[in-house]
Amino acid sequence: MGESIPLAAPVPVEQAVLETFFSHLGIFSYDKAKDNVEKEREANKSAGGSWLSLLAALAHLAAAEKVYHSLTYLGQKLGGQSFFSRKDSIRTIYTSLHNELKKVVTGRGALGGTAPHVEELLSHLSEQLCFFVQARMEIADFYEKMYTLSTQKFINAEELVGLLDAIMKKYSSRFHHPILSPLESSFQLEVDVLCHLLKAQAQVSEWKFLPSLVNLHSAHTKLQTWGQIFEKQRETKKHLFGGQSQKAVQPPHLFLWLMKLKNMLLAKFSFYFHEALSRQTTASEMKTLTAKANPDFFGKISSFIRKYDAANVSLIFDNRGSESFQGHGYHHPHSYREAPKGVDQYPAVVSLPSDRPVMHWPNVIMIMTDRTSDLNSLEKVVHFYDDKVQSTYFLTRPEPHFTIVIIFESKKSERDSHFISFLNEVSLALKNPKVFASLKPGAKG
């Protein structure tokens, strides 16, 4: 006869309630999570003790998470609302929650019939949740910082990556209890996506093909995983005259914003690396693919050239000081190529309608050199007419390493609003501060 398998000890009621709560929170079902702990609290209100205190804190945590993912707290002006309509800032909400959890950790209000081993579990979980709440406050501050950057001429994504990395390192493995794993997973998914996107933004601006491609792909894959969580959830809608229907849960604003940032970076990536990407497919297929981008920079510039009979529109990459520059596409890390010199330090990484006009390039570089301070303002449009070659040049700089030039083989006025507004529009779309402004729900962008 084989030995009898010992029966597993029954899971304490408290543990089962906690596991259900965090599994709901892990799939962003804030209302279900909140309802469950409130029902449990109502059923145990005579019990008192740490358990009741923790249930109250968890109901507040579910409500705080809902506000956090909605991003409605961004850009709130202190004292700008009446006492009755004022929404508490996310920091106030989480600070209050942190204080509640601290009381459970220290065992204040622990009078009640909770078993000692359960008390220990509740204290341990509350301690880890304190770290989670602190991490949330820091990431909320990070979103606030990104939102305020929308008014800047240039957003330094590399600096943002450094700040986010520091937060991730600070809280790594700080809320690792198995019961909290759904919460930890959803937190990690969010910061991973954000980090991949900000790294991609920094790398596209440095014209680094493979690293930006890898980060965009990683962000895309993780956003798909996240999106499937909402697809699997259905919410039932009861109709006025009976009957009901089910539909997928609407994702929170934070998820939708990360999707928007990814799509904007994808449009910019497909423009900056158009040459390398077009080598992988046919011209007609490439045109179809870029037309799906929003905005479609390639299509927009092609239309402008046809409409105004421009000789050329180029995106120039200033690679001076960039030791790793090797030209379009991917290059083996150990392949050697001599650093560019002279005019090759200013390649046209995009040139429409065909290859860069070599005869105009000395003029373009001369204008870039002479008007450096104007171009470095990242908002001025520079005009130059050369009567020797009967050609007009309009230049602007959307970001530090890149300049857009329009070349006309005829005389054009520096006050021509069509050309200036077009350059401003393309430049603004490449910087896209509107994406950062649209972090706040209801903002245009």
Swiss-Prot record:
One GO term of the biological process aspect: negative regulation of TORC1 signaling
Matches recorded under InterPro entries: C12orf66-like_central_sf, KICS_2
Subcellular location: Lysosome membrane
Recorded GO CC terms: intercellular bridge; KICSTOR complex; lysosomal membrane; lysosome
Predominant place of localization: membrane
A Pfam family of this chain: C12orf66_like
UniProt keyword S-adenosyl-L-methionine, yes or no: no
Keyword terms: Disease variant, Intellectual disability, Lysosome, Membrane
Effect seen on changing D296E: In MRT83; uncertain significance; decreased interaction with SZT2
Chain's role: As part of the KICSTOR complex functions in the amino acid-sensing branch of the TORC1 signaling pathway. Recruits, in an amino acid-independent manner, the GATOR1 complex to the lysosomal membranes and allows its interaction with GATOR2 and the RAG GTPases. Functions upstream of the RAG GTPases and is required to negatively regulate mTORC1 signaling in absence of amino acids. In absence of the KICSTOR complex mTORC1 is constitutively localized to the lysosome and activated. The KICSTOR complex is also probably involved in the regulation of mTORC1 by glucose.
Disease / disorder: Intellectual developmental disorder, autosomal recessive 83: An autosomal recessive disorder characterized by developmental delay, mild to moderate intellectual disability, and poor or absent speech. Additional variable features include seizures, hearing impairment, hypotonia, and non-specific facial dysmorphism.
Family: Belongs to the KICS2 family.
Subunit structure: Part of the KICSTOR complex composed of KPTN, ITFG2, KICS2 and SZT2. SZT2 probably serves as a link between the other three proteins in the KICSTOR complex and may mediate the direct interaction with the GATOR complex via GATOR1. The KICSTOR complex interacts directly with the GATOR1 complex and most probably indirectly with the GATOR2 complex in an amino acid-independent manner.
Protein name: KICSTOR subunit 2
Taxonomic source organism: Homo sapiens (Human)
